[in-house]
Amino acid sequence: MSHVPLDPETARKVTSSLNYRFEIGGEPLVIAIAQDAENGDVLMTAFANEEAVYRTLTTGYAHYWSTSRREVWKKGEESGHVQRVVEVRVDCDKDAVLYVVEQEGGACHTGYRSCFYRRVTRDGSFEVVMDRVFNPDEVYR
């Protein structure tokens, strides 16, 4: 059963209680992790400021803070590969959030379902362990 979206007042109560201890470019942030609701796979990790968490809680779609563009962005707003949030969890220090999501398409901008598509091998190289689910050259024009 989905626990989001929340009403605005409840969402503000949640966002104001988090510990935005990480700072990039002067922006207070929490770590945001997306996990596949169906199989538990970790899909991606990013950052979220207070507004990104608020939008996630009130819309039911994952929002993050872009450290390069310095703005809140909805996952999939360009690609269509949105993350519908079914649950939000908070870690023990309240400085990280876990978005349990139903992923549409791929989570990674490189075309993979997960950003964790490579594993470290015995010789220290990286081995691709997943197939691409979309062609990024066709999606991001």
UniProtKB/Swiss-Prot annotation:
Zn(2+) binds at residues 92, 108, 115. Gene3D superfamilies: 4.10.80.70, Phosphoribosyl-AMP cyclohydrolase. Pathway: Amino-acid biosynthesis; L-histidine biosynthesis; L-histidine from 5-phospho-alpha-D-ribose 1-diphosphate: step 3/9. Transmembrane segments: none annotated. One of its GO terms (cellular component) is cytoplasm. GO terms for biological process: L-histidine biosynthetic process. InterPro entries: PRA-CH (IPR026660), PRib_AMP_CycHydrolase_dom (IPR002496), PRib_AMP_CycHydrolase_sf (IPR038019). Keywords: Amino-acid biosynthesis, Cytoplasm, Histidine biosynthesis, Hydrolase, Magnesium, Metal-binding, Zinc. It is an enzyme of class 3 (hydrolase). It catalyses: 1-(5-phospho-beta-D-ribosyl)-5'-AMP + H2O = 1-(5-phospho-beta-D-ribosyl)-5-[(5-phospho-beta-D-ribosylamino)methylideneamino]imidazole-4-carboxamide. One of its GO terms (molecular function) is phosphoribosyl-AMP cyclohydrolase activity. Its main location: cytoplasm. Mg(2+) binds at residues 91, 93, 95. Belongs to the PRA-CH family. Catalyzes the hydrolysis of the adenine ring of phosphoribosyl-AMP. Homodimer. This is Phosphoribosyl-AMP cyclohydrolase. It comes from Methanopyrus kandleri (strain AV19 / DSM 6324 / JCM 9639 / NBRC 100938). The lineage of its organism: Archaea, Methanobacteriati, Methanobacteriota, Methanomada group, Methanopyri.
